[in-house]
C-alpha cells in the first residue's frame, strides 16, 4: 500500500476542464520520466535522477487528480471510499494488491 497522506490542491487551478487537461499533461510527464529511467540502463547517476523525477511527476499526477475532484465536488469528496471500491474491483479482477 502507498500512503500519500493529505493532498493539498491549487485553489485557483482553473475550471474542471482545465484541471482535466492538467492531469493528462502531468501523466504524460510521468510517462516521459519513466522512459528516461528505462533508457538509463547502466548509468547509475541517470537512473537515480530518473527515479527522483518519476517520484516528482507522480506527486504532480496525484495533486492534479485531487484538484480535478476538488473542483467538481469541493471539500470532503468521498475519494477514500472510492479508492476502497477501486481496490475491491481490482481484487475481483484477480489483480494482486499490496
Task: Briefly describe each language-model feature range.
Residues 1-98:
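Flexible "arm" and connector segments at domain edges
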